[in-house]
Amino acid sequence: MLLGFFRLLFKGLYRVRLTGDTQALYQQKVLITPNHVSFLDGILLALFLPVRPVFAVYTSISQRWFMRALTPIIDFVPLDPTKPMSIKHLVRLIEQGRPVVIFPEGRISVSGSLMKIYDGAAFVAAKSQATIVPLRIDGAELTPFSRLKGLVKRRLFPRIQLHLLPPTHLPMPEAPRARDRRKIAGEMLHQIMMEARMAVRPRETLYESLLAAQDRFGARKPCVEDINFQPDTYRKLLTKTLFVARILEKYSQRGEKIGLMLPNAGISAAVIFGAIARGRIPAMMNYTAGVKGLSSAIAAAEINTIFTSRTFLDKGKLWHLPEQLTQVRWVFLEDLKGDITLADKLWIFGHLLAPRLAQVKQQPEDAAMILFTSGSEGNPKGVVHSHKSLLANVEQIKTIADFTANDRFMSALPLFHSFGLTVGLLTPLFTGAEVFLYPSPLHYRVVPELVYDRNCTVLFGTSTFLANYARFANPYDFYRLRYVVAGAEKLQESTKQLWQDKFGLRILEGYGVTECAPVVSINVPMAAKVGTVGRILPGMDARLLAMPGIEQGGRLQLKGPNIMKGYLRVENPGVLEAPAAENQHGEKEAGWYDTGDIVTFDEQGYVRIQGRAKRFAKIAGEMISLEMVEQVALGASPDKMHATAIKQDASKGEALVLFTTDNELTREALLRYARQHGVPELAVPRDIRWLKQLPVLGSGKPDYVTLKNMVDEAETTHE
C-alpha cells in the first residue's frame, strides 16, 4: 500500500519511465549496477524496478535516520569495504536468488561523469557469477537532491528515465594474486559502465544538442568567448545562430555543401549551427592548404559558395585565395547585415520563443559536416561526418573525462582541424564549459597569457605547439590547468619533461584521426600510462591486421558510432565512398575503418603507436619505422625539427633521407644515440639534408608530400 502510494507520487512528480528488457531481472543470480547521481536513486529503483532487490549501503550511511525511515520500502544490508565478510554476505544473497543493487561508484557523482569504480562490486559479480544488469539513471542529477549545484540548471521535478541495459557477465579474471584479480575485475566493470552510458546517449542532431545544452545549463550561462572579450551566453549564441540560419537561406539550397573559411571566433560557431539547422552541410575549408589544396577540396565536395570574412582575409593576408579560386562564389559575413528585413527579424524573434521549429527535418544519421584530411600523403579528402558520429565522439570524451560547467577551454587549434572542432568547440559547448576561441595556435607568447588571464582549465594542442607555449610562458601562467592534452602528432619526451619541470603538469597524450571525429584513444587522470596514447574509447571495436615484416602489433582497424559516413575524393567528385576495410582473409567489411597506423596493445588495453603503415621503409629485408628514425634524430638534436622520407636504393631496395633544420647534425651523432638506445644501425640515415625551415601543414605536422617531391626531384636531377 505504502509502496504503491510513493510509486504514484513519484510517477506524477517526475514522470518516471523505465525502459529496457526487464526479463533479465528475473534470472537466478542478478547484480544490478546503476550509476549514482542523486540521493533519490535508491528510492527510484525500489519503487520502479519490477523486483524487490537488496541494496548494498555503506555502514556510515545505513545508520542514519533517513535509512531507518525507508525500511518499509527498501531492503538493504550494511556494507563495510574494510571487512571481507560484507562482500561474502552479498555473494551469499545473490546465490540465494535475491537481486542485489550495488552502486559501483560508491558515492554520488560531483561531476556528472562516472566517478571512480570500486573493485568490490566487480569482485562480487565475478565471485558469484551473477548476471550483471547495468542501469542508467538520467534526469535525477537535475534535482536539488544531486551534488551538481552550480554545474547544471536545477529544477524541482525534471523528467527521470531508468534505462535497463542488456545483461552481461563478468568472469573471474586470471591472476596469481587476489588483489590483482579484484583490480582487473574493477576495470572490466568500469568498461561495462562506460558502455552503458554510450548505449543510452540521446538521438539528436547537432542543433538539437545545442538547444539541450541551453536547457541543461541555462540560457544565461556564458559559453563562447573570443578576442573581442565579450562572452556569448547560450541565449546570445542561439540568437546569432538564428540570424545566420535565416540569411544563409538566401545564398544556398537545402542539402547544399557550403564552404566555411572562418577564424576561431564566436560568429564561426553561430555560422556552423545556423547552417546545420537549415539543412546545409558546412565544409570547413583549410585556408593553410594553399590554392592547390583548396581547389581539390572544392572539387571533391562540389562546393559552389564559400562564406568568409573580409576582416579575416585582411588579417590573415589571404586575399589571394578569392582572387585565384574563382570557380566558387565568395560571400562575406560583413555584407549580410544589410540583407536583414523586418520579416527576417520577426522570424528570428518567433524562433527564439520556439527554437526547435527553426530546424528543418533531419535525422542523426544525416550528413552534418565535412572536414578535410591534411593532405600529408596526397590530395586532401573530404571526410563526411553525420550528427551521430560527431556527437558520439563528444559523448565518448564526456564518458571518460570529468569536464564540467566550471571548466574553461582554451581553443587555439583551427576549427577546420577535427581536433579543434570536436574537442575545441563541440565538447565544451555540450558539457556546459566555457570556451575561449583564439585565431592562431602559433602565437606562442599570447596563448599562455590568455590561459592565465581567462583562468582556463583545459588546454590542448600538438606537441610542437605545447613545447613552444612552455618555452614562452611564465611558470605561473598555467596555475589553473587541470587537463593538458596532446594530439595530432607524437608527444616528444622533451616537451613532456619541460611541462613537468616548469609547471608541475602532466601532459595527457591521445590519438585520433579525422575519420573518427577524431578522438580514438586518450589518457585521462583515471586511466593513464606513460608511453601510450591511452585506451580505445568506449563504444568502439578495434582489431589488428597482421602486416608482413612487422613482428609486433598490426594495422589498426576501427568500428564504432564515431566513424565517418565516408570520403569525398577529387577523383570522383560528390560521390560518397562509405568506409570499408579488408579483414585478415582479404574480404572487404563495411563499417570498418583502416587507420593505416601500426599499433600494439598491452595486457591492460593501452595503445602504443609504432608508426604509419605507409611510413615504413624496407631496407635490406627489414621493416624500419620512419617515426623511429625521427625519434633518433630528435634525441640527438632535441631543439630542432626533423622529418624522414624514402628514396630507392639499388643495393638495399630503399634508403632513408633525413631532412633537418640542424646544420651541424652528423651521422656519427645519430649512430651514437642509436647505440645508446638499442636502435638498429639500419635506422640511421646516411643521407642527411639540411633545410632552413621544414615545410609544414596547418596542423604543425611536416608536409611529407612536399619532402617526397624534393627527394624525387633530386634523384631525377642526379640521373
Swiss-Prot record:
It comes from Klebsiella pneumoniae (strain 342). One of its GO terms (biological process) is phospholipid biosynthetic process. The keyword Cell inner membrane applies. The chain crosses the membrane at residues 258-277, 409-433. Residues 15-138 are annotated as: Acyltransferase. This is Bifunctional protein Aas. Plays a role in lysophospholipid acylation. Transfers fatty acids to the 1-position via an enzyme-bound acyl-ACP intermediate in the presence of ATP and magnesium. Its physiological function is to regenerate phosphatidylethanolamine from 2-acyl-glycero-3-phosphoethanolamine (2-acyl-GPE) formed by transacylation reactions or degradation by phospholipase A1. The keyword Nucleotide-binding applies.
